[in-house]
């Protein structure tokens, strides 16, 4: 029986993160400059407290358009209680979680602390490597 790799073997660990007190305008600029769709929000101990997504930032932008006020912090706009996956979860179970969810990536926790992030791409890559997917000619 082949052992299925774990999320920890394929997740990204070098993440952009925010704290709840980060100014929303600074966080938006970081997302734009890094060309990413969102980032985890952590407290001083590294515990995940939320996610700031482009959708959350659109709320701040609309607020600014209506009220001419770009004030606020990440805590004012972030999504709280995000869905997460455990770093010890195998890739098959992770794939099942992605199929049941609208999300393209999940924060990854170990003992309750943020240790990485895993995307659909990461899971697909890992499963492909595991079961020897046929190499496709990528020169289209």
Language model regions located:
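The conserved cystathionine-beta-synthase
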Residues: 18-35, 42, 84-102, 109, ...
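A glycine-centered beta-loop-beta connector
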Residues: 31-34, 39-56, 98, 106-122
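General secondary-structure edge motif
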Residues: 11, 25, 37, 57-58, ...
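Short charge-dense sequence patches
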Residues: 4-9, 23-28, 41-50, 76
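Tandem CBS (Bateman) regulatory domains
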Residues: 1-14, 53-84, 88-99, 114, ...
